[in-house]
Regions:
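Alpha-solenoid helical repeat scaffolds
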Residues: 38-39, 70-78, 108-112, 128, ...
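Short, conserved micro-motifs composed of acidic
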Residues: 47, 85, 112, 119-320
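Canonical positions in the second alpha-helix
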Residues: 60, 98-99, 132-133
Length: 320
């Protein structure tokens, strides 16, 4: 009998030891997995693939022990930064709150949280966080402007203007539609940039998590009403991302933005040109603005006389 009792106790101890070993291995594997996710996320983030980076940081955050507050804070911050870049404001606000809850040391988390809340119309909490940030960084212009906006927005809502802004149902799809540009002798064509599911590009953007954009066009019918947009004919659109176009004064040249793909390098935006012939647009050709190959050039706009080309860029010498 004593032998049986001792045998059972021994088995219990062995079982407990096995469970403890398995628990330690699980924690170790989870920690290793989290580090792998962070490294992958950092690689995606470095080339501007914010959506793909967010997926890795989210996994890393969930695999990090709650008691490991510094790492939880850092991974929540990285996740929030991804969401901020792609305008996922609700998710960004939640991630910044997690970073602050685990005492992330950079006060910018408080500022960015306030901005994300303001974009959602949560003026009360945004105001509170702007004021908290201003206590840490007195006189900061972004926080000062944000605070003022939160104070003014409720008053503006009580005193609406004489103008009514509404969505145009024919021109908008289920995804983003933006950068409209009128075209034609009678301005009866409207070119838009769209990410709707029907576009030609089959690739899901690692930046946004949706399809890469193409340029579509809508035309007015005999009654002067806009028709459903369709993809631009010719060789304008490709497997890459095209959008944000404008036209030369004579209507013969289109200036557009294109972002090509490279798994190893950031997606640098470049300006291309396309010429119109027989009611269709040619395959775009890159417009060399500078020998700088490490900067982006996008969102072109041509002056009325056709002599000046305005664009946005992150090239050295700017203020952004």
């Amino acid at each position: 009998m004593n032998w049986l009792i001792l045998s059972n106790k021994l088995r219990m101890r062995q079982g407990l030891a096995l469970l403890a070993t398995l628990a330690c291995l699980t924690i170790l594997l989870s920690a290793c997995g989290a580090e792998t996710n962070v490294k992958k996320g950092d690689q995606f983030y470095a080339i501007g693939e914010y959506f793909d980076a967010s997926a890795e940081y989210k996994k890393a955050y969930s695999r990090t022990a709650i008691k490991d507050k510094p790492k939880r804070a850092e991974r929540a911050w990285k996740l929030a930064e991804c969401y901020r870049h792609i305008n996922y404001n609700a998710k960004a606000a939640g991630a910044y709150q997690n970073a602050l809850r685990y005492h992330y040391p950079d006060s910018l988390a408080l500022l960015y949280l306030a901005q994300a809340q303001q974009r959602q119309g949560d003026y009360k909490n945004a105001l509170k966080n702007y004021e908290a940030y201003l206590e840490l960084v007195p006189g900061d212009q972004l926080a000062t402007n944000g605070r003022l906006g939160c104070l003014q927005a409720p008053m503006w809502k009580k005193k609406p203007t004489l103008y009514t802004i509404k969505k145009e149902p024919v021109l908008n799809g289920r995804r983003s539609d933006y950068s409209p540009a009128l075209f034609g002798d009678e301005w009866d064509q409207l070119y838009i940039t769209t990410t709707r599911p029907q576009i030609e590009s089959g690739e899901i953007s690692g930046i946004t998590g949706i399809k890469s954009a193409d340029i579509w066009v809508s035309k007015k019918d005999e009654k002067g009403k806009w028709e459903q947009p369709t993809s631009v004919e010719g060789g304008l659109n490709s497997e890459y991302e095209e959008g944000a176009c404008c036209f030369s004064p004579d209507g013969r040249t289109m200036y557009l933005t294109r972002c090509t793909f490279d798994a190893e390098y950031p997606r640098y935006a470049e300006i291309y040109t396309s010429t119109r012939s027989d009611a269709s647009w040619s395959t775009p050709q890159r417009l060399q603005i500078s020998k700088d190959t490490q900067s982006s050039y996008a969102h072109p706009a041509v002056s009325p006389d056709g002599k000046w080309l305005y664009f946005v860029s992150d090239m050295p010498g700017g203020m952004g």
